Amino acid sequence: MSQTEGARLFRETWIAGVREHFPGEPKPGYVTPWEDTPEWEREAASAVYEQVRQFLALSSGHASRLTREQKSRFVATCWTAQMFKHFENPKPGYVADWPDLPDWQKETDSDIFEAIEKSLS
């Protein structure tokens, strides 16, 4: 899978997770299709996809044994680093520590890890 395809997988899984886990109606930006996603966000999705892919590869696939919480924490931490890369002063919600994230976001981050994992097998 190419970096672009991986980034799209990240975004499409994010949108599916938001639709499944978000309570009520999500903000439009949460479900913006890939074609309309800002370039910085595409780059961030690509980077996090690649970090998860490499993490799985470097563990010889054994990172799949992580709990859903551990998978979610990994994705969230990678995403936070991208927010600091792309924004001088990111919004606090963009860089919140994992325990402070809403449950829907934690679940969606786990879904992202598992979608990348599945794409590699």
Predicted segments — roles?
Residues 1-121:
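Alpha-helical propensity feature that highlights long, continuous alpha-helices across diverse contexts
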